[in-house]
């Protein structure tokens, strides 16, 4: 079952709540585990949460509560919206624990591409830490992504931030996951044939987190940038299995 919920006053302060049809093996006296989903699209207004609907449905069918959220994104006439984006994502994460039936001690965040970047920000900055963070094909190094001109126009990162990295290091460093310390275990899932965001970015991020003492697993998968959000593909099935295993046992993310 899916229903749209407004969690704020703005037009983008909306989310789709997917509920399992019946109580599954993960529900106990404390409630049901829940997952917040963050879509990608290089923080552009042209892309929305419908990108994550297929995996939202798959996770709900498996027995989880799924919170597929929208957030403010940049438009050609309204750039430099990073503060709004980060505020929205952290607020949406805080809203999750108050939803009916959610076991707040077993919540996870999953994001794809630019949403993977945001998921890593949640893992590092949120007051209530996730049980696990799954960053799929994450733009985990903003400086490297800008240098490589990732995205169709090659300038999506600096348009979202609102400035070039040259001479503006402070906001870039403050927003860059590779320099953060996640407060929960992280799965960096990445397709080996990804041409939109190279797997080398997740590999470098996993190494940086591990060097700082965080739990971070790089999970290379078959396929491309989009197969890992396709519930019929083996790449996504591997991710889902890992998430369900973690929420059930807490022993492994990879």
Residues covered by each model-derived region:
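N-terminal cap/lid segment of alpha/beta-hydrolase-fold proteins
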Residues: 1-27
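Short, surface-exposed "cap/lid" segments of acyl-processing enzymes
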Residues: 23-30, 35-58
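Catalytic nucleophile-loop/oxyanion-hole region of alpha/beta-hydrolase
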Residues: 46-56, 67-105
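C-terminal catalytic histidine-bearing segment of alpha/beta-hydrolase fold enzymes
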Residues: 79, 203, 210-254
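Glycine-rich nucleophile elbow surrounding the catalytic serine of serine-hydrolase chemistry
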Residues: 111-121
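Hydrolase active-site cap/lid region
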Residues: 121-167
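Short beta-strand/loop motif that positions the catalytic acidic residue
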Residues: 181, 188-190, 194
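Conserved alpha/beta-hydrolase "acid-adjacent" motif
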Residues: 195-204
